[in-house]
Every structure is written in C-alpha cells, then in structure tokens.
C-alpha cells in the first residue's frame, strides 16, 4: 500500500474496512466463470460490511510506516538485520481475534508479505520469514488462521506483487531504487516464487476468504503480470477464495471484488476510469 496513506494507517494499524458491495458479473465474461461457492462467498463478503486490516511486519519496529525501507533508501541487506530483533512477545492470536470479533468485524485481513519482501508466515521458498529469520520462531499467520476458524471469523491475506529485496524482481519498477538490489534479474523465477508462496498460503492455512493483491502499479501499463494464470491457480486451490487487486483499474477477469486505497467508492480521486466499476463487490 502506498506511502501516502501512512498518516491514516499507522503501523501496526487496525484499519476498519467498510464494504460497499454489489454482486454482478462484469469481469467474468472472458475466461472466468465463478463457481457456486465463489458466488456464495461474494454474497457473504457483501453482507459482512466490516472487516479489520492488520498491517504488521518488521517495519513496525521502526515506527516510520511500512514504506520506510523505500522512503529512507535503506539497503535491503541492512534492513533485513532488523528481523533479528523482531520478537512480538505479547502476540496472542486468541485475544486478537476475540477483540476484533467483538468489534463486529466479519473478517480479518493481514499482511502475509509486504513490499519489503519479509514473509510473516513459515515459507520453504525463502529464509526471510518470521520463523527462520527472527528469534520469535512462530508462524503468526497459522496461529491467526487456526483461531479464526475456532471463533468463526474469516481470514483474508494481503500479498504484495512487488518486492524491494529480491533480485529477481526485475525490471525494477517505480519504487525501491535505493534498496541496493541488482540491475538485472529473471522475472520468471520471481513469478514462480510468488505462485509457490500463494500455493502454501492456500494449502497449509485452511480456508482463506480472500487474497488482496497490491503493488501492480509499480510497473508501467502493459507489463505482463500473468494475472490470468495466477488467478486460475488461486481459484483452483480454493474456488471460494475471493481475489481483489489494488490497481485502481477496471477489474480483470478472475477478480471477485474491487478495493480502493486513498479513496471512497464513488469519489474516484485516484484516477480510476470509472467504466463498469460498480459491477463487482467493492471494498
């Protein structure tokens, strides 16, 4: 999520999210037909109206917002050293979920991996994660997932498309130029890495209500993110899992709801074309 929102969402933040939703099939016409369980999940998401967003990562320790690595031009190797001091000893999934549920929220969305590239779950495709790189050694996403199931609240996962640390995130986009990454790389391996992680999240953590993508705006228009293949993977693994993408464009086939940042649905201050945007559930 972009740095301009930092004054509104402090890290770690609890952002209340109101869903302004309508059910329709605008983005389904080309190559995507949602399953009955997906349509039911859309209805439940629309009816839920209110969720809580947990923006949490090693950036939280700096108190400078989630874009600190980029805005301060911190070398990715120096930034990664912060993981050795990340020990959220007071984290209690049962208490967090209970408090959120008591607020009336119907779902929780948490950053599984933000733009700094640090994974808040135990992944076998990188050592740069909360289990392998920190003294905490606990998978907070798994603990939250288990507690959400116990308490009857849905878990959504935010996942960044861009990465300021990995060398295979190339070509470099509009951000992260001061983080010490290489000037060359292999996009195909990065794309494979993302899909491997998404497979882990949708296989090892039980039912996931939605995947919230962010960062597509880092690359110029026309860049091939291979969204169709990625979205098909998600819906194959969990047909009821909803997909949203913070790109502020007309929805792509495979997306089940639309999210807005620095905007309220209907105001369109962020430059969305305005064409057919009311055809999907809006967040």
Regions found by a protein language model. Name each.
Residues 1-3, 19, 35, 42:
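Helix-centric, low-specificity signal for extended rod-like, repetitive segments
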Residues 26-283:
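Mature catalytic domains of secreted/periplasmic carbohydrate-active enzymes
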Residues 16-26:
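Hydrophobic h-region of N-terminal signal peptides that target proteins for export
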Residues 10, 17-19, 44, 235:
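A generic structural signal for short, solvent-exposed coil/turn residues
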Residues 2-16:
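Bacterial N-terminal signal peptides that target proteins for export
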């Amino acid at each position: 999520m972009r740095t301009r929102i930092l004054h509104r969402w402090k890290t770690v933040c609890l952002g209340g999210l109101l869903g302004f939703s309508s059910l329709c099939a605008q983005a389904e016409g080309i190559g995507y037909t949602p399953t009955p369980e997906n349509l039911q999940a859309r209805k439940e998401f629309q009816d839920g109206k209110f969720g809580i967003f947990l923006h949490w990562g090693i950036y939280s320790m700096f108190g400078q917002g989630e874009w600190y690595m980029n805005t301060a031009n911190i070398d990715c190797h120096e930034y990664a050293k912060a993981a050795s001091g990340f020990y959220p000893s007071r984290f209690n999934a049962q208490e967090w979920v209970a408090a959120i549920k008591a607020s009336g929220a119907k779902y929780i969305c948490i950053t599984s991996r933000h733009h700094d590239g640090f994974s808040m779950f135990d992944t076998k495709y990188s050592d740069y994660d909360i289990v392998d790189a920190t003294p905490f050694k606990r998978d907070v996403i798994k603990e939250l997932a288990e507690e959400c199931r116990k308490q009857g609240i849905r878990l959504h996962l935010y996942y960044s498309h861009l990465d300021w640390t990995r060398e295979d995130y190339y070509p470099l986009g509009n951000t992260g130029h001061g983080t010490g990454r290489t000037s060359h790389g292999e996009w195909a391996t990065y794309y494979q890495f993302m899909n491997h992680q998404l497979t882990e999240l949708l296989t090892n953590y039980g039912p996931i209500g939605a995947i919230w993508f962010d960062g597509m705006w880092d690359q110029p228009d026309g860049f091939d993110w291979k969204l169709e293949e990625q979205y098909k993977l998600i819906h194959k693994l969990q047909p009821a899992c909803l997909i949203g993408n913070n790109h502020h464009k007309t929805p792509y086939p495979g997306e089940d709801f639309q999210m807005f940042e620095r905007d309220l649905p209907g105001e369109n201050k962020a430059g969305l074309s305005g064409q057919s945007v009311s055809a999907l559930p809006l967040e």
